[in-house]
């Protein structure tokens, strides 16, 4: 799955994710 800053495409968790799905930093964003 593709992960990006904001929300994970699969799961809906907020934060910054790397390509491997590792949380780099907790950044709750509003969408």
From Swiss-Prot:
Biological process according to GO: cellulose catabolic process
Claim: ATP-binding is one of the keywords in the record: no
Superkingdom per UniProt: Eukaryota
Keywords associated with the record: Carbohydrate metabolism, Cellulose degradation, Glycosidase, Hydrolase, Polysaccharide degradation
Catalytic reactions on record: Endohydrolysis of (1->4)-beta-D-glucosidic linkages in cellulose, lichenin and cereal beta-D-glucans
Disulphides: none
Transferase listed as a keyword: no
E.C. code: 3.2.1.4
GO terms, molecular function: cellulase activity
Further remark: Active towards carboxymethyl cellulose.
Protein's recorded name: Endoglucanase 2
Lineage of source species: Eukaryota, Fungi, Dikarya, Ascomycota, Pezizomycotina
